[in-house]
Design a protein with these regions (language model features):
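Catalytic alpha/beta core domains of metabolic enzymes, predominantly
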Residues: 78-225
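Active-site-proximal flexible loops/turns
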Residues: 14-16, 46, 67, 131, ...
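Glycine-rich, proline-tolerant flexible connector loops at the mouths of alpha/beta enzymes
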Residues: 2-34, 127-137
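Glycine- and other small-residue-rich loops at beta-strand/loop junctions that grip anionic moieties
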Residues: 9-13, 17, 35-39, 60-62, ...
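General beta-strand structural signal in soluble alpha/beta enzymes
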Residues: 7-8, 36-40, 59-61, 85, ...
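Amphipathic coiled-coil/heptad-repeat helices and related helical stalk/stem segments
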Residues: 21, 68-69, 140, 173
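Catalytic core of soluble alpha/beta enzymes
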Residues: 22-122
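Receiver (REC) domain switch/active-site residues of two-component response regulators
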Residues: 4, 55, 186
Length: 227
């Protein structure tokens, strides 16, 4: 197991979030070489965190709202960072893939206008709990497929959102991750301590051709057997 990137968020009420986030990032970087996802809804905190970060950061996140893009994209450009963007705007969260794609188109245009390379854009196609909407996962998978076909962008998603409020969440999360990878998902925010989810990711990578000749799969199997 193990994470490939760490998300750092210091959104604690009634605190100096910019100062806290900057200190947290420096502390985390003193402990690990893993890349960091700088997570805040406060623009000043993002600026403070990016200013002390050593390396190429990933910002989590911005929406398709005009004022959010106008505030955050200059920071993305200034610090040569990457950005996670969500296809929702002032009207709320679109429920269908075509509605989400309208906002994805808007985000792509804004990113290009800001001079940020599209390879630095990561779209969150929005995963909602299937416990509240039986069509939720189908809409998310269709959004992933359309983003892949139209733009070929990197994508990340909350891997456990689909199972919220339901029993046996690990089984649902593992199945969803496998389906999403097949549709074109390239990364996910997930619990790297859950063996079934990690195994679903590794197996999916092998089965869709991301793990040539099963090198990673075989290596991990041997490591587990010899542990």
């Amino acid at each position: 197991g193990g994470a490939d990137m760490l998300d750092v968020n210091m959104g604690v009420p009634l605190t100096d979030e910019p100062a806290l986030l900057a200190e947290a990032i420096k502390l985390v970087q003193s402990l690990t070489d893993l890349p960091i996802c700088i997570d805040s809804s406060v623009v000043e905190a993002l600026d403070a965190g990016l200013a002390v970060y050593e390396g190429k950061a990933l910002i989590n996140s911005m929406t398709g709202e005009d004022d959010r893009m106008e505030a955050i994209l200059p920071l993305v450009k200034k610090y040569n960072a990457a950005i996670i963007a969500l296809p929702n705007d002032e009207t709320g969260i679109p429920m269908t893939a075509p509605e989400r794609m309208v906002i994805v188109d808007k985000i792509v245009k804004a990113v290009e206008k800001a001079g940020v390379p599209l390879e630095d854009l990561v779209i969150d196609p929005l995963a909602m709990t299937v416990g509240a909407d039986p069509e939720a996962v189908k809409n998310t998978l269709e959004t992933i497929h359309q983003i892949k076909e139209k733009y070929g962008l990197n994508m990340s998603i909350g891997g456990s959102n689909v199972s919220f409020g339901l029993p046996n969440r690990h089984a649902l999360n593992s199945s969803f991750i496998a389906m999403a990878i097949a549709a074109g998902l390239t990364s996910a925010i997930m619990d790297a301590r859950t063996p079934s989810v990690v195994e679903a990711v590794r197996a999916s990578d092998l089965l869709i051709g991301n793990d040539a000749w099963g090198g990673n799969w075989i290596t991990r199997f041997r490591e587990a057997k010899n542990a």
